[in-house]
UniProtKB/Swiss-Prot annotation:
SUPFAM superfamilies: YajQ-like (SSF89963). Keywords: Nucleotide-binding. The keyword Ribosomal protein does not apply. This is Nucleotide-binding protein MAP_4063c. Pfam families: DUF520. It comes from Mycolicibacterium paratuberculosis (strain ATCC BAA-968 / K-10). GO terms for molecular function: nucleotide binding. GO terms for cellular component: cytosol.
Amino acid sequence: MADSSFDIVSKVDRQEVDNALNQAAKELATRFDFRGTDTTIAWKGDEAIELTSSTGERVKAAVDVFKEKLIRRDISMKAFDAGEPQASGKTYKVNGTLKQGISSESAKKITKLIRDEGPKGVKTQIQGDEIRVSSKKRDDLQAVIAMLKQADLDVALQFVNYR
């Protein structure tokens, strides 16, 4: 019998983030408490999002609106990292970044967790920014997925290529 396997990745669907950003921009433009504050939200490069407003509290509220839209689109908050408001002239800015991929440090932590607490006979292999998990039994792989979903890790995980 051949080994079964799956890959652990940390990727964010950019289209879903774009939809959340557009919904947040629409809400910021129409909400009464944001009128007259020049609050904007926009992409800044491929992985960064910039929020600007005239006051520090309004820019924090704009971050909360954006996070709410991300949650509604099933995007984990672990995948979005918002900085602190920074004053620049008459406006306040928050730069947020999307976290893509599993860092080598996080990958080592995940493989150690699988080795220590997972079922015996499960093999892990780090392949760049993803982890391949293989075993002879599919039940063992499902147990690993359940264990990782329960674990408190600092990255958003998705499980793909389950074979």
